[in-house]
A protein has these predicted regions:
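Outer-membrane beta-barrel proteins and related beta-barrel translocases across Gram-negative bacteria
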Residues: 1-189
Length: 189
């Protein structure tokens, strides 16, 4: 984890080319130890900086010429013994030349893996036709915005965010007809 916040002053106060900026860079790399919390993961790869940081505060030529940076923070959770899982992440792509940001915050996916809702807990006799019906579920939520660095927390940017929600519920079954033909109807909702 590293945070740098240089105060930049170019030229003399009162001159037409005078510039004063407070720049910063946040750099963070993290990966959770899988043994720390079984069933969940957390990782972060953050390199977030103001657009003037590379121009006025870079410590190497490569850093000064770098125009694109990106950051991602991710979390996922699986509930052991259940069909449920959740993943969430956020990402930011920056262009220091134009001072623009592309933000995806949050992206969330909730899954329910394949299960048989009509299957009896204790099978007695022959399997019924409806016990072969399986279901899955996937729900996705995405939210994104593009804005200038100086406008990112404005009311207008928040109002212009693009967001969407998507459901996927496949229902299927497989039946054996005359011991030679497999019939597998599927419905997607």
């Amino acid at each position: 984890l590293s945070f740098t916040s240089p105060n930049v002053r170019v030229g003399d106060k009162g001159e037409p080319d005078f510039l004063q900026q407070n720049n910063f860079q946040l750099y963070w790399q993290h990966t959770q130890d899988p043994k720390a919390n079984p069933g969940s993961t957390f990782s972060a790869s953050v390199d977030f900086r103001t657009s003037g940081y590379n121009r006025y505060s870079a410590t190497s030529l490569n850093e000064a010429l770098q125009t694109q940076t990106s950051s991602t923070i991710s979390y996922s959770k699986s509930w052991l013994g259940t069909p449920f899982s959740l993943s969430a992440n956020m990402s930011v792509s920056q262009n220091s030349q134009s001072g623009t940001l592309s933000i995806a915050l949050p992206n969330v996916v909730f899954n329910v893996s394949t299960f048989y809702p009509f299957k009896r807990k204790e099978a007695m006799g022959k399997q019924r036709w409806y016990e072969k019906i399986s279901l899955r579920y996937t729900g996705k939520f995405n939210n994104k915005a593009n804005a200038k660095e100086s406008e990112i927390f404005t009311k207008e940017t928040l109002q212009n965010m693009q967001y969407g929600f998507e459901h996927s519920i496949p229902i299927s079954a497989t039946y054996n007809i005359f011991n030679y033909i497999n019939f597998g109807p599927t419905i997607n909702y």
